[in-house]
Curated annotation (Swiss-Prot):
Name of the protein in question: Ribosomal RNA large subunit methyltransferase E
Active site: 161
Residue sites binding S-adenosyl-L-methionine per the record: 60, 62, 80, 96, 121
Any Gene Ontology CC annotation: cytoplasm
Family stated for the protein in its record: Belongs to the class I-like SAM-binding methyltransferase superfamily. RNA methyltransferase RlmE family.
Species: Dechloromonas aromatica (strain RCB)
InterPro entries for the chain: RNA_methyltr_RlmE, RNA_MeTrfase_FtsJ_dom, rRNA-MeTfrase_E, SAM-dependent_MTases_sf
Known EC number: 2.1.1.166
Location relative to the cell: Cytoplasm
Molecular function GO terms recorded: rRNA (uridine-2'-O-)-methyltransferase activity
Alphabetized UniProt keyword annotations: Cytoplasm, Methyltransferase, rRNA processing, S-adenosyl-L-methionine, Transferase
Amino acid sequence: MKRTRTSKAWMREHINDTYVQLARKEGWRSRAAFKLMEMDDKDKLLKHGEVVVDLGATPGGWSQVAVKRVGDGGLVFALDLLEMEPIHGVHFIQGDFREDEVLQQLEEQLGERRVGLVMSDMAPNMSGVPLVDQARIMHLAELGLEFSRVHLKPEGAFLVKVFQGTDYETFLKQMRETFKTVAVRKPDASRDRSPELYLLGRTLR
């Protein structure tokens, strides 16, 4: 397939991106690792011994950060429809986290432990049509919120990527109805022109 001018420009920007270069140098699977590290440094999400679920984990940048920071006493579960190269210490489950079979696998591995952090950097396949892409990413965020309501321990946290635009305020309201505190984050590693934000909900109501 012939690349469009837009896709060529994106590829040029991606290759020259400081965070992309730094990720390669330091062995992170994606530039997104720096976003999570910055937010964790600020909000202290990845506590030693914590149980973490990474929704839409592939290629694994966030899982790499999580498993390093929760330490040997913690557990990191990575879920994705796509395959992911193994990461030492990360329990990967391939499949749709809404399906009973996938949830059963997760629950069997969790045992009696409750999840302290659900994190989602999920993004849809972008169509290039802003309204369509906005609707898709907000739907993914809603799925992550539903998952969190069921699986988080009472004092747990949910970190999720959203886009500013249609349905953002509605979703923010849902977050505030679900959690006692909700913060908005825009990490330095997020591209300036990107509409992405991260919402952090803490302590279930």
